[in-house]
């Protein structure tokens, strides 16, 4: 009878280490590829966000300019008419020539229903003020959407600072606009004029902020 001796099988460390190395390389390649994809998507999202923010700011700026012009006219009209008001904004003490001049400068601001001759050619006019308050729609949809995309770290710090500062001031302006609309609804004209005067200052500042952001928005993509 012949006997065979089983030899001890050697463990192949080189093979095992090679497999481990391949797995390690594979994992790192997968991580790198995922990071590359995420970075590529973030850059693409950032470009879209900048485009949408630019469009939003331009539209808001146009809305603000229209409202600013209209509401500034209201302030001018009130400042000239208030010296002619007789106790309230329903009664006006003026000559026909003065009324014609005021109406030509500020059409529709005061509408006469009847008049009574007093003396020296002065009439007491009975009527009422009619104010068309321009309410701008100042959006921040693009900015809010950008903040939900987790791409703010892709933006330059100065760019982020300017954007947040601009939208913060815009919210303050919107709050004052709402106050103005409420004062008009309640026919609180003195309060309305105070608010519009304050808004006049805020609007100029916001308009400058819009201009600054639009001039520097391309730097956000650097």
What does each of the following model-derived ranges do?
Residues 1-14, 35-222:
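Long, hydrophobic alpha-helical segments that serve as membrane-spanning/inserting helices
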Residues 17-32:
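Hydrophobic membrane-insertion alpha-helices, especially the h-region
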């Amino acid at each position: 009878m012949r006997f065979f001796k089983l030899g001890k099988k050697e463990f192949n460390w080189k093979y095992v280490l090679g497999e481990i190395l391949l797995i390690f390389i594979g994992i790192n390649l997968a991580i790198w590829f995922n990071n590359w994809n995420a970075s590529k998507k973030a850059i693409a999202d950032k470009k879209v966000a900048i485009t949408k923010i630019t469009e939003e700011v331009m539209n808001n700026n146009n809305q603000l300019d229209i409202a600013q012009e209209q509401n500034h006219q209201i302030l001018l009209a009130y400042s000239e008419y208030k010296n002619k008001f007789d106790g309230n904004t329903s009664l006006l003490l003026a000559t026909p020539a003065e009324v014609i001049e005021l109406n030509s400068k500020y059409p529709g601001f005061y509408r006469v229903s009847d008049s009574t001759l007093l003396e020296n050619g002065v009439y007491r006019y009975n009527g009422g003020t009619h104010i068309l308050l321009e309410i701008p729609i100042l959006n921040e949809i693009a900015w809010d959407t950008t903040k939900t995309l987790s791409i703010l770290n892709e933006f330059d710090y100065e760019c982020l600072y300017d954007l947040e500062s601009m939208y913060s001031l815009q919210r303050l302006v919107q709050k004052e606009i709402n106050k103005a609309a409420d004062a008009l609804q309640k026919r609180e004209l003195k309060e309305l004029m105070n608010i519009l005067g304050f808004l006049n200052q805020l609007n100029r500042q916001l308009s400058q902020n819009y201009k600054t952001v639009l001039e520097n928005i391309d730097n956000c993509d650097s």
